């Protein structure tokens, strides 16, 4: 468990060269993987990807390291040639190219990734339509929960996946859905849950359903996810003895890790991604 922290710029774990590189990139970039730079150890990892039908009419983006690639990772099950897996959940714009790029970036760390589709193939850049799509799911959450649970079942059935090492990760609307999956995973418990500025549940009794570590990434200027709500969330996790890492970044708002957002903050995005990878390595391998 960790106390609520507010990482400052001078605590960011960026190398000098990375800082210079980040500062030279303009706001016109639409792909966060251009900005999140790994230390190079897995830059040569080759990936395989395909579109898969994992739930009713829903098709997701499956990506994983090719068998010929050498991934530097602490995978506990590498002796039987299986990898940990992550269900990646899109924001309110749908399963777009940015989410697929993030899935690729995560796969290079040694994970099998299934980026799900909760919008029946629809991708939008229109905020009004995005709000309609997400509100439809909030009004009738059962379908989305069934979709996400099927994603876990699908991953666990793959021969290259360790079914005991599956996590979920989502941003914004996807962060909320990552938490909802955690609260509805009785049949197949997860190994970790990652939430980037998603709507929270703060009732201790409800959160008691979670029996694995939780990582939360938030901004203190986020009007839709206020800091007070984050504090209550952390307190409820602690009350249940749920291992957690909660980070609230100073001076940034909602969707700060999305390069198409007006709130985009590249340095905080880099630091949050490093924390995400460290968290997943610790609890997935």
Locate predicted features:
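Serine-hydrolase catalytic machinery in alpha/beta-hydrolase-like enzymes
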Residues: 11-12, 20-38, 43, 51-156, ...
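Short alpha-helix in the alpha/beta-hydrolase fold that links the catalytic acid
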Residues: 102, 226-236
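C-terminal catalytic histidine-bearing segment of alpha/beta-hydrolase fold enzymes
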Residues: 238-285
